């Protein structure tokens, strides 16, 4: 899959993913808007440039896997999967309603393309380590990708799994930290500081790649390719992404820690969607009725 799309094409896809994520959360009226916005570029690069997956066969043997350990960012995962062709875009407007296939947190029993149920912080990362060990045993050539939040990185389970991954020389494991610096209770460094974070990962026998702008497609793409090239190093790789919580949505960016799980009223949703689109294309009635334009003329296959 690597190299199929130009940077400009990936940026266009990312804009559509961001728009659809905002639309889904806005139609519901509440959600983890901040932590969803900060990872849009990463997921776009993974699913449209890096990962060996087949939407027509979500359980394909030897496929790469992505486990979103910060499971509250499920809406962005869903928007990305929809754009990649796993299911119809209209399903996004059923986010977290009764009987939906798209609960607020990732659920492998409900949603095509989800490889692990997550939400209890720290557990998804541990499962990714286990999946990487299993892939090594199976010799299937797969790469396991996983994403943790920086607030989540205060969980002891993260570091137990990190130690195991380093000791088992999991070169087939690439992890990301969404370093947006905010958690539910405030600034991560004020609540329970992580720095020097890169040194900590190196001490656990991991390669570390630091990305100055984790919301820049080119920088994220380059980091992922660098990590892929380190597969034979015998070490897992952690990519630290410095991101902006709520990226691309002024309302969400200003909320800081308050946007961990925030109300998203129709009037703010309209502003946000028009801001992301770059032109006026949505009304409050559209938000209520889930009548949202498609920023891409066609689904990207």
Label each residue range with its predicted role.
Residues 2-74:
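N-terminal amphipathic, basic-rich helices that act as targeting or association modules
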Residues 44, 79-82, 93:
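Generic alpha-helical structural context detector
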Residues 45-49, 83-84, 133, 164:
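Active-site catalytic microenvironments for nucleophilic, acid-base chemistry
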Residues 53-59, 63-65, 105-296:
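Glycine-rich ThDP/TPP pyrophosphate-binding loop and its adjacent helix/strand module
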Residues 75-87:
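Alpha-helical support elements that line or immediately flank enzyme active sites
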Residues 86, 90-108:
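Conserved AdoMet
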């Amino acid at each position: 899959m690597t190299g199929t799309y130009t940077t400009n094409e990936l940026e266009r896809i990312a804009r559509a993913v961001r728009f659809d994520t905002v639309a889904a959360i806005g139609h519901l009226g509440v959600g983890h808007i901040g932590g969803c916005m900060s990872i849009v570029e990463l997921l776009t690069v993974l699913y449209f440039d890096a990962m060996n997956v087949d939407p027509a066969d979500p359980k394909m043997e030897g496929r790469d896997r992505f486990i979103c350990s910060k499971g509250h960012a499920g809406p962005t995962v869903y928007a990305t999967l929809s754009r990649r062709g796993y299911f119809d875009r209209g399903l996004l407007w059923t986010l977290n309603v009764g009987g939906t296939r798209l609960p607020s947190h990732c659920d492998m029993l409900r949603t095509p393309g989800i490889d692990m149920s997550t939400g209890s912080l720290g557990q998804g990362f541990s499962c990714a380590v286990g999946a990487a060990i299993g892939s090594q045993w199976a010799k299937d050539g797969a790469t396991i990708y996983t994403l943790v939040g920086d607030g989540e990185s205060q969980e002891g389970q993260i570091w137990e799994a990190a130690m195991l991954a380093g000791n088992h020389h999991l070169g087939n494991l690439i992890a990301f930290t969404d370093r947006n610096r905010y958690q539910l209770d405030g600034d991560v460094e004020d609540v329970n500081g992580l720095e020097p974070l890169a040194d900590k990962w190196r001490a656990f026998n991991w390669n570390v790649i630091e990305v100055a702008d984790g919301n820049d497609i080119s920088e994220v793409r380059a980091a992922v390719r660098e990590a892929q090239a380190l597969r034979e190093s015998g070490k897992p790789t952690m990519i630290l992404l410095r991101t902006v919580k709520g990226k691309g949505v002024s309302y969400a960016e200003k909320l800081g820690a308050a946007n961990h799980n925030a109300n998203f009223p129709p009037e703010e949703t309209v502003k946000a969607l028009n801001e992301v689109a770059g032109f006026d294309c949505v009304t409050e009635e559209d938000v209520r009725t889930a009548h949202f334009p498609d920023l891409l003329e066609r689904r990207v296959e």
